[in-house]
Amino acid sequence: MHEMALCEGIIGIVEEEARKRAFAKVNVVCLEIGALSHVAPEALQFCFEAVAARTIAQGAKLEIVETPGTAWCMACSKSVEIKQRYEPCPSCGGYQLQVTGGEEMRVRELEVD
């Protein structure tokens, strides 16, 4: 379960921001997760509670905003939305797709006291 390691990284980012900006408590952590990132949101929610315990983020709500996968189709020269890798272009049916978005995971916003 790599979600545990991802949550440890998220808490590391939150704690670093707390040191830089001198806030005492995190109420909400908002993440942006791409549809092609291979991250299971349910598992991330579960792991976040465990990793956040006894940190500045203890009790914080984890909000997840899922972003779509996008790709450039070399066959029809269109930017298209895809749900998973290796599926055909929804516009022309071709398989010459280059992923352009949806692989990322980032801390989008923190609500703090």
Curated annotation (Swiss-Prot):
InterPro entries: Hydgase_Ni_incorp_HypA/HybF_CS, HypA/HybF. GO terms for molecular function: nickel cation binding; zinc ion binding. Signal peptide: none annotated. Zn(2+) binds at residues 73, 76, 89, 92. One of its GO terms (biological process) is protein modification process. Keywords: Metal-binding, Nickel, Zinc. Ni(2+) binds at residue 2. It comes from the Bacteria. Pfam families: HypA (PF01155). PROSITE patterns: HYPA (PS01249). Belongs to the HypA/HybF family. HAMAP family: HypA_HybF. Involved in the maturation of [NiFe] hydrogenases. Required for nickel insertion into the metal center of the hydrogenase. This is Hydrogenase maturation factor HypA 2.
